[in-house]
Amino acid sequence: MKRTISIIAAGLLFLFPAISNAQVAITAVPFLQIEPDSRGAGMGNTGVAIADNASALFWNPAGLAFQKGSNQASITHSNWLANFNVSDLFYDYVVGKYYIEGIGTIGAHLTYLNLGEQIETYEDGPEPISRFNSYEVALGGSYGYQVSKNFAVGSSLRLIYSSLASGTSVSAQKVNPGSSVAVDLSFLYKTDIFALGGRDAQFSFGSNLSNIGPGIQYTDNAQKDPLPQLLRFGWAFHLDLDDEGINRITLANDISKIMARTKPVYTTDNDGSIDTSMVASGPIEALFNSWSSFERFDGQKTIEVGLLQQFMIGAGLEYWYADQFALRAGYYYEDPNNGDREYITFGAGIRYSFLGVDFSYIKTLESDHPLANTLRFSLLIDF
């Protein structure tokens, strides 16, 4: 894939936002928000209250505490932004969980987003200056602890490395790789199985505050971009449709919000001029100052994003037959002023012996949306 510096610069606008008088919520490394498993993606990006397989490491690591006596590995692949028809723009997620008697279930994951080969050119001509590859990667581990029969807590630790335009310059500033470390904190509550209309049912509720950590610095100055610290909470309802539990459905709903802010810092040069740089609010500070509106530049004008507009909503339905065949559907929504992603999702899964395969498909409401026709494929292996 070969893209000129104009496309690179357009992407880096997210890293070097226009300065406004209000705090803004632009974050670095948004690849950490990509829902990694085809099951949750097929259910409208839901999973914080389900978290019953290896991908609990992403959705809710507390879910590991309820997964006793089972081991699993999974890999997900997606040709990201398929509408761009670019072969080396892809996303991979590898995850595994392992149960240790007397300790519990632990897990590890690797997330990789390849952005392909870039070409830096002069502003006044197509002559190449340099070529480089852009990619982002995260590596982490998780653990869930069962506090009681129905309640568990969990945590993850991950290392993050982002190499977008290393060695190039943007606005006379040299761009370096960025790195950081992040923590997730979560809980999951499951009711006892109860009877509903003569059928077994269960309700669960969970929350996960992910990517808690210091901002990433790409340039030599003090500018830092916040991590996509995300608060996700939701519920799930499981119901057997017959006495034997052969037919089963799950309804799920996730609500999430970015808990991050950048703020301007002003310094005075020796000649009296004032320089302004954007610095990420600390993760604890952002938990308190993210509950208000913020302003951002949409390319043409400055717009205000209200608090309710900052929430992202996903809802999904899953049907299982004999724990072997699954069908899924869902809906995902973001406000037009805050991401503007709205689409329906479809998915299916099959389980046979120790193997499982899931896939999901995104049907955007706009035919030319970058996420249109995005497919994810996941392979699961129990051992």
Which ranges hold each PLM region?
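A detector of low-complexity, intrinsically disordered, Ser/Thr/Gly/Pro/Ala-rich segments
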Residues: 2-3, 17, 121, 140
